UniProtKB/Swiss-Prot annotation:
An example Gene Ontology CC term for this record: actin cortical patch
Organism annotation: Candida glabrata (strain ATCC 2001 / BCRC 20586 / JCM 3761 / NBRC 0622 / NRRL Y-65 / CBS 138)
GO BP of this protein: barbed-end actin filament capping
Lineage, highest ranks first: Eukaryota, Fungi, Dikarya, Ascomycota, Saccharomycotina
Biased composition (Polar residues): 103-122, 143-199, 283-310, 350-366, 375-388, 395-405, 455-465, 527-556, 659-671
Domain of life of the source: Eukaryota
Keywords: Membrane
Places the protein is found: Membrane raft
Protein known as: Altered inheritance of mitochondria protein 3-2
Keyword Membrane: yes
Amino acid sequence: MSEFWNNNKDTIGAGLKTVGKYSYKSTKFVAKTGYQAGKSHYQNSKAKREGRSQEGSDDSGQTTPNVHINYKDPSAFPPPPVKPGQLQYHGSSGNSANGSSATIPTLSNTNNTAQLNEQPYMNQINSSNQIYSRPQMAIPEQQVATPEQQMNSTTLPSQPQMAVPSQQEHIHIQPSNPQQLPSNYKPQEQYLQSEQLNISDRHAPQPMERPAMPLPQHGNVPPLTTENVHPNIEADISSPAVGPQFEVKPYDWEEQKTTKIEIPQVDLTSIPPPPTHRDRNTSRQGSNSTPPSRTHTGNNTSTASVTTTGIVDGNLESNQEHTPKPAILGEYDDTLNVAYAPPPKPFRRATNNSSDLKLSGAQNTKTPPPPVVLTNKSAERPNSSNVMPSLPLRQMNTKANSSENLPKAKILGEYETNVDVGIAPPPRPTYRKTDTEANPPNRPLSRSTTEHKMSSISRDNYNSIKSSSVKPPVPKRNTGEREGAQELKADIAERSQEITPTPGISGIYNLDKKIDFAPPPKPFRRAQTSSDIPQKSSLVTDESNISVPNKSQQPMQEKDSIKNATPLYIPPSNNINFPPPPKPHNKSLEESHTPSNKLSEKPKPPKKPEQLKDLNLSTQQADKNMKNKDQLFDNKNELLSTIKNKKRPAPIPKPKPKSLTSEGNHMNLNTEKGKETTIEKPDESKFLPISSFPPPPKPFKREELSKEVVDSVGETADFTKPKRAGQLESTQTEKSNSKGKAPPPVPKKRNAQSKSSPSLEGSEDNPFSKYLKDAVPNEPDRLHK
């Protein structure tokens, strides 16, 4: 590491200097840029705050910027509408309102560019109003109090009526002053006025008269304002306008009740009938109009789609009756009769042996039906091998049947049924064969078309064909080649000469190909046991299941016979015998019986093995099974010998609870055969015979170690050592005869205390009980209980 630093310290130092230099420059640049941006932002915000406060000082401290200077002068707007019977205010021109007559304000057409630009737009509005004139409420036009122009005001009479006169009037504009309109004047005012008046220059059907609904009584309505106002143009006002003066008239409730709304009666006979449905042969009565032709429709589409019927005085215009009306997508001729071919009938195979099902030796061809020709008589399709005769065609009217030999167009065009399709037919469905079927059961029906002949398929490559009627016999199960393969091949070869190759779903299958896979095993099924099966010796498969000898007089001879047993040779037969499965160990049943009963009772004979289903094994398979059984017997004998020679572990003493009585602790020790002590058997005896080992020694309690039994310290020391079975039985019999009851077990860690302190014989289990007696003095009885 030192050499690396000595060699590269100059380079590292130069690099650090360069990095520090550029980092300083970048930091300085970022700091300057941020300072300048913050400073400029502060100055801009300060300037905005100062300008806002100066502008808002006149407006009683408004925080929003004052932009009312960009609005239009209120004097340029028309006055608000008046109520029915209310007098209009007097303008600067001094003209008074006349309540008896309703006049239309006239305007003069000046040379103003704004008005010139407005004329085409107004003409367009008038032409649109000509199409359908909707009745509007009579809102009068008020006078605009400007020095540049003055308008005549109108008032409504006491009874509401339409403000549209019966005659057509042209709009005349009378110039009051030679001056032009101000620059801020917009054509929206005249647009609103023209829309309310609904007066057009052209002669058009006038709308039906409808009385205007009276306006509700409200306060002063705010003036109508135009939406599109240029914000940068200021209104130059030369002289102040005169304020409006209103006269309010109370609303009359009885006037609405006395006014009757007249509904005109429309003559329904003069209305043209609705269009009829295309499938209906007869049209409705009272139709005076004929369906227009395509040429008239193309010429009058634009006019007919725009013009509507105008109703004047309950009469319809006569020119509307003969106006051509276009349909949704064209014209429909109800007299035409469309004759379509009926849908094909679904394929149904005949249940009986009909004459139309004919077998050929190699093929069964299907002839397609001829093309359908619509004639007066129903065209029937010829019967084929699997096609039923179709339904007859529907007979239409005589007009459609006039052209007999001309094929009619279908829904999407004409169809040709005799086109060759290069697709193989689908496989034949499988149905149950009837009793009257003349076909042989082993000869299947082959199905192919004339276009797809199977002559190119060589029989050398496909000698055997898998079909539904030809089923090879199930071969026997073995590990080598299949039995009867030669007979199967010969049988298939004979049948393949009579059967032509039949194409399957994905191709043709060859059963002659050799298959090297073993046959699948048959399912295992338990069969009933028979009495004629010879009883075999049960095999020991678990440590808990060891066969107990039947004869109690010669137990050792039986054990030796089991140890030296050799498996018997079983000839191959259809029935294969396996040993029964081991029984689960039940500890509760073992503890319920005493050892004396276990030795006296005879063991149950081994269960007979269950029979298996016939497996049809060959001699080779039987020999292989016998070899496996020999190996199995050898392994079981070795396992049995190792279990018997295994050394038994030392027993674990367990303390006996004090709740047990002395009767349960009594030990009946007799040297007779078949009787043993009633000690608790440890868990290690599950896998060993009971009679092979003596009972384990049981420790005694210190309380029962009297001077008669324990004479010296050496004898007590020998008590902890494991003794032989004979010595232990002799000592236990002497103590049981002298005391009459068995002492309880002693814990493990009490042996050392029994040597040094024999004075603790009368003490309890707690060794510290003598120290606890006077350790804490008794408290005085304060409560005198």
